[in-house]
Amino acid sequence: MSFDRPASNPPDDAEGLPIGWDAAGYDWSAPQSHRPDPGTLSLGVTHTRYSIDDWGSAPALASAKAVLTATASYQNQHILGWGAENPQPSPGRFDWSSLDRRMKMIRSTRGTPVITLCCAPDWMKGGRPGETNWKRLEVAPRPEHYADFAALAAAVARRYPDVRHFQVWNEMKGFWNAAGNRWDYESYTRLYNLVYDALKAVDSTIAVGGPYVVIDIWANAKNASHPSALAGTCGVVDQRGLDALDYWLRHKHGADFVAVDAGLSTRDQGTITATTTSGELFGALTRWLRQRTSLPIWWSEFHVGRADAAGQQKLTARAVAALLHMADQGAAAALIWEPQGDTGQPHAPALWTSTNGDGGGRPLAYGEAVARLQQVLAGRAGPDAVSWPASELGLAWGREGVLLVHNAGDRIDLQIQGRPLNLGPYEVRYLPLRAGTPVEFAVPGPSAPTAPAGQCLRLTDATASSAETR
């Protein structure tokens, strides 16, 4: 197999080295920050309980901040939970101290801040004023307190005027209709509309998004309690998440982006084992969403599961492949969940190691891959920067380099300008190639083409038609 993309000879100082050998590696001493780019996928993170907190050693914090600067255009923080204490413990009394610390850290690393308006103080959901019961964190506010929560959202917007993007709630937590065995999208949308109106009253240019609903996947339609018509080689989408999305699209007062969430697991068989399929799923869902709405698509909670140390390389390749599929299909943003590493086992791929201790805050393989992807997308070579010459091989082209992800468990042998390049199982590699001269990649032997997004999830006229009415 051969194909052409804009590239050039390696830099002079790389002559004689195996093709693809990046002599310098990523320069973490001078990390380049990236502003969100409306023309391509903007990568970001969602900070969770532990994320570059003050009690880490100074060298570890500095190292982690360098990784964060290079990898995250957007940095998202919840207002209560996931690293933030209760901002309004009782009516009329505010405590911004923990949220202030997180916002200060985001500013210090040149991130574009995002706030997720979740969760609600206890007194809004039946608890005693002044108390915070963390076991009830994910309980939704009571309807009689929806206006109070909207007022809290407005107070947050006034305190942090540099925050231009707000997500309303998280995964519709607490909004469940048990009698109907479905999401309580009516109640969520009522809350969303009150929050939307309150934020726009503070500043009409603030960007507000929802519904931050989980899109569940089944491996087999026979096992699905609520199968949808949106199905294909990647599985069957659960109808209940689609119903919630469609109701919100039809009844929202307004929105500036659509927030969604999905993972690499199925409801019936656990983790999706076909690595090429798992990446294609995010591209197919992005394509379907873009046919439902003209709003930008945000993957508000991106994570790919957990593994022990031996499985981290595979998960990293799966994550990068999914990000390439999102970019290829026109997603606007992807927020990586929990960017700081967990010392326990198994754990999710992280961008840097824990900052709790000497030698912490070091960049991990996932962090370097995301930093390189940021670099490539920022300097992308033309409108079609992402290509899939084979189902297991993805490329993202920039003006000065290309990022390759090999998403399979065997070795793959390539050729660039007649010189060999070997990628190992689940390898992600950056090649410092300048744009300008066509380069032929030769993939010896047969390789199945990547499945088009329409086969991964077949789009019928009914599933692809726009759901938005205003």
Predicted features along the sequence, with ranges:
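Noncatalytic carbohydrate-binding groove/subsite architecture in carbohydrate-active enzymes
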Residues: 184-319
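Alpha-helical scaffolding within the catalytic cores
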Residues: 25-30, 56-64, 95-102, 151-153, ...
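Conserved beta-strand positions
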Residues: 45, 77, 168, 210, ...
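N-terminal substrate-binding region of glycoside hydrolase catalytic domains
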Residues: 9-155, 161-168, 172-183, 213-215, ...
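Solvent-exposed loop/turn segments at secondary-structure junctions
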Residues: 49-52, 80-83, 119-123, 170-175, ...
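Aromatic- and carboxylate-lined catalytic core of secreted/periplasmic carbohydrate-active enzymes
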Residues: 16-27, 307, 321-410, 427-451, ...
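Surface-exposed beta-strand/loop patches in extracellular or lumenal glycoproteins
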Residues: 408-418
